[in-house]
């Protein structure tokens, strides 16, 4: 990991632990962790030459198969590191996609994952091939160069085919969203970091039995269920989990999930209470940032602090003081998907729907403007 903020003595440890957890989930055995502090990443290797040399020795000594970087690697950095270290080099984006692949069950998820892979690796493949066949021009289109262009064109065609397929799915999803709007059925989307308990709460509220696992990203494609809250028909949607410091390109590759969040009447942001306070705060702030980047307004967000069953009365009271400050400006409540304790959440949803459906009175400035225009017209 490259740490670019020399004054960060805590946050990078959280990020590194998160990376280790993801690596273990993907089936890797983590044998060591290395951090370098530099204010600016190096163009070719991300890290400095001395650290590359140290890492190379470690790879050889420990017989390492993969080196996983927390930082996003450019195609150039990935290629040069792979050549220098003589092993597979991946970043957190690729690691996340590996976990997605292990969890993918439906065709839509697999299609989105493949598209994300192609977007990431096509530039790398082009750079790798350009270096490999550099200088190999004994005559026009040597065999190596010909093979390169043939493979590159095949990859481009595949990427285009998948992109067009996803665009069709996007239009179909937009049509479904529009149909729900016409029916007047509000949509409630559950969002949050992976393992926050979204699917467990979805099952509890909707009476479903969708797969739940401690492994990250059990849910990749959105799940829908028509339910009722105080005789009000409501669509509940369970979506893919977030990760801390989520790569924007990864978000862009999962447009179908973004559409569900962006079009929701209410987004229930689940935050798990089984983490230390600093991680609870980090995950909450990161989740809010992701939702804002997607286009979800704060007024449509309700915070559900899940796994409240882990708290006794004294702990809950003490934690409430911390959360009241942290969640200032948001409506929030404690929930427990495990114990099916979510009545407070349903009350907040009902209240929020009433607020959102309430006609808005025009601003005072607009009224004054209209009055002046009317007055001028009558006098003329």
What are these regions (language model features)?
Residues 1-98:
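N-terminal accessory targeting/assembly segments
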Residues 2-5, 36-39, 98, 239, ...:
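G-domain G4 guanine-recognition motif of GTPases
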Residues 6-10, 209-211, 240-251, 272-281:
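Flexible beta-alpha connector loops of hexameric P-loop NTPases
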Residues 15-24, 56-59, 73-83, 87, ...:
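Conserved C-terminal guanine-recognition region of P-loop GTPase G domains, centered on the G4
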Residues 19, 67, 118, 201, ...:
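Residue-level signature of catalytic and energy-coupling elements of molecular machines
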Residues 95-113:
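Short alpha-helix plus adjacent loop in nuclease-associated cores
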Residues 119-196, 202-203, 292-380:
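C-terminal-of-GTPase-core extension/linker across diverse P-loop GTPases
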Residues 183-186, 205-235, 243-256:
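Switch I (effector-binding) loop of TRAFAC-class P-loop GTPase G-domains
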